[in-house]
């Protein structure tokens, strides 16, 4: 087919004329033409559709410097941030060559994982925001009110600022879930409510008709621990009472250790109680002998409990010791607030001496101290190291307290009532405030981590994902015996405990066994005589002695060397050997 001709007449309308040529032979088609013959004929007559022109190839890109680009090298700090001990693996310490090769493969796999994680971290392009005044305006940031911030941000962020005015039942204590999605509030006069604070969906609301000292979420939003007048109660997400923990009496503060499933309560009679909520068993309970324990927090890095006392000291507790692991003199007056960051590196304390002090938990040394105009009661630390302090009816938020660059407050908000509780929302730029007039959700730009770690806690998890996470948490549960100041101790072998168990086992060799005391049950209508009763006693005693002798024989084999055995197999005895 020849090309299409286009012509433009004087009227301005395009006209298209198409001409066709007949390629049939003049004599006609005598035989049936094959596909290959038809293809050759089409190419010969010029009507082929195949484009004989070669494809244009893209010219090779040449580097201006004349050499290939080198891959970006990761810095040592980026690799150390994600290193979990791969450099400490020594394949040469293995005995056999097969084990050495396996350990080399394992070490290479760990190193590749570290590099992949460090490279993926570069793709986290979300940055934290902050509040800054205009260049022409020389006003300070703490003069900006919450109303101005809510009008400047997007609609989704503006809805996160709200207030619940409940002056009849306050003051309130609050708590958020680990993923920051759900909120529970408890008033001193018995008001209790739980809700999804982002969608404002109310789970339940009721009055327990008793004084509420503190509230705490357990491993999911379906379980809520409430410290009431006498005992601690556990409710579900519908407000139904599930348990009454009478071992936690007169509790003032509550903390939950998610990796150990331990609910910790500090009572007004100086007792510290640990309860395993997965099995409902009390793990430890001891008197601290330090007065009322109304100031308490946990170190998320190692699950150590920090308590503040009226003599200005802060004590660090573990369920494995009835004495404090560390005792620090933090203030010259009573301690009113304690907070530890998520990494477990810094601790903030406040006291009646109008001081807010920042401590290095790793060295137990004070880094900085800041003077405030009034006595500070509560304190909280966000994921990005913003420190919030409750000063009477006001809440002051500071930036850079841990590195000494803080000179004035970052934000200030008047709550209209005495502040009793502060909680930063994980993964959000929001600070929850419980006060005498109700609850306030305060916007704090730059407080939360913008890159959500869904493996750690997912704010958008579904019901099936929540159930799966709950099962994984139970499978990965850490025993309370492993709680210590150094969280890396969980990767080591407890040689002292192993030696102690071995010594206890060896005592069976030289300690006199205790007399077996067994009294068979008396049957009223039994026809057995007295000697049969004694026979039953002897059978049970002989069985106990036999088990003990077998255990003693096994220990003797381990402790003492086994007798030498000849290499030659013993010959079978023949009946005529007696005649030799």
Curated annotation (Swiss-Prot):
Assigned keywords, A-Z: Nucleus, Repeat, rRNA processing, WD repeat
Knockout or disruption consequences: RNAi-mediated knockdown results in induction of glutathione S-transferase gst-4.
Xref: PROSITE patterns: WD_REPEATS_1 (PS00678), WD_REPEATS_2 (PS50082), WD_REPEATS_REGION (PS50294)
Top-level division of the source organism's lineage: Eukaryota
Protein name (database record): WD repeat-containing protein 46
Annotated stretches, region: Disordered: 34-108
WD repeat coordinates: 193-234, 235-272, 274-312, 315-354, 357-396, 399-436
Lineage: Eukaryota, Metazoa, Ecdysozoa, Nematoda, Chromadorea
Protein localization: Nucleus, Nucleolus
Basic and acidic residues: bias regions: 64-85, 98-108
């Amino acid at each position: 087919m020849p090309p299409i001709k286009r012509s433009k007449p004087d009227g301005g309308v395009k006209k298209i004329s198409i001409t066709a040529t007949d390629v049939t032979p003049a004599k006609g088609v005598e035989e049936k033409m094959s596909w290959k013959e038809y293809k050759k004929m089409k190419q010969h007559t010029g009507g082929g559709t195949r484009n004989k022109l070669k494809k244009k190839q893209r010219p090779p890109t040449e580097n201006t410097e004349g050499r290939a680009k080198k891959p970006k090298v990761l810095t040592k700090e980026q690799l150390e941030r994600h290193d979990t001990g791969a450099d400490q693996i020594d394949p040469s310490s293995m005995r056999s060559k097969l084990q050495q090769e396996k350990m080399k493969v394992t070490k290479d796999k760990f190193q590749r994982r570290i590099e992949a994680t460090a490279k993926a971290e570069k793709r986290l392009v979300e940055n934290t925001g902050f509040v800054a005044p205009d260049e022409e305006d020389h006003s300070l940031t703490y003069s900006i009110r919450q109303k101005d911030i809510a009008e400047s941000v997007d609609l989704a962020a503006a809805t996160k600022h709200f207030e619940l005015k409940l002056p009849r039942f306050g003051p309130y204590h609050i708590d958020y879930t680990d993923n920051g999605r759900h909120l529970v509030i408890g008033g001193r006069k018995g008001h209790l409510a739980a809700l999804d604070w982002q969608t404002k969906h109310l789970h339940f609301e009721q009055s327990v008709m008793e004084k509420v000292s503190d509230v705490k979420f357990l491993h999911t939003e379906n379980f809520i621990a409430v410290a009431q007048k006498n005992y601690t109660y556990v409710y579900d997400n519908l407000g139904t009472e599930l348990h009454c923990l009478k071992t936690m009496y007169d509790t003032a503060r509550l903390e939950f250790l998610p990796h150990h499933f331990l609910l910790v309560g500090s009572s007004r009679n100086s007792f510290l109680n640990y309860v395993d909520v997965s099995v409902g068993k009390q793990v430890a309970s001891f008197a601290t002998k330090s007065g009322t324990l109304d100031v308490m927090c946990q170190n998320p890095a190692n699950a150590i409990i920090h308590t503040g006392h009226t003599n200005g000291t802060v004590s660090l507790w573990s369920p494995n010791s009835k004495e404090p692991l560390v005792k620090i003199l933090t203030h010259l007056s009573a301690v009113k607030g304690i907070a530890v960051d998520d990494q477990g590196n810094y601790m903030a304390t406040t006291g009646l001496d109008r001081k807010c002090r920042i401590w290095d938990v790793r060295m137990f040394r004070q880094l900085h101290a800041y003077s405030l105009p009034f006595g500070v009661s509560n304190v909280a630390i966000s994921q990005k190291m913003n420190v919030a302090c409750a000063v009477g009816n006001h809440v002051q938020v500071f930036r850079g307290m841990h590195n000494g660059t803080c000179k004035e407050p970052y934000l200030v908000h008047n709550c209209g009532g005495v502040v009793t509780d502060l909680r930063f929302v994980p993964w959000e730029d929001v600070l929850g405030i419980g006060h005498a007039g109700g609850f306030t959700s305060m916007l704090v730009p730059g407080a939360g981590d913008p890159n959500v770690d869904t493996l750690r806690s997912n704010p958008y998890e579904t019901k099936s994902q929540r159930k799966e996470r709950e099962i994984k948490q139970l499978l990965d549960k850490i025993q309370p015996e492993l709680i210590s100041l150094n969280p890396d101790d969980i990767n080591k072998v407890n040689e002292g405990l192993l030696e102690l168990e071995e010594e206890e086992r060896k005592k069976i060799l030289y300690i006199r066994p205790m007399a077996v005391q067994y009294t068979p049950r008396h049957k009223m209508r039994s026809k057995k005589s007295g000697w049969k009763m004694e026979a039953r006693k002897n059978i049970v005693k002989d069985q106990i002695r036999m088990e003990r002798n077998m255990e003693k024989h096994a220990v003797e084999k381990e402790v003492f060397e086994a007798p030498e055995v000849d290499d030659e197999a013993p010959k079978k005895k023949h009946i005529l050997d007696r005649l030799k």
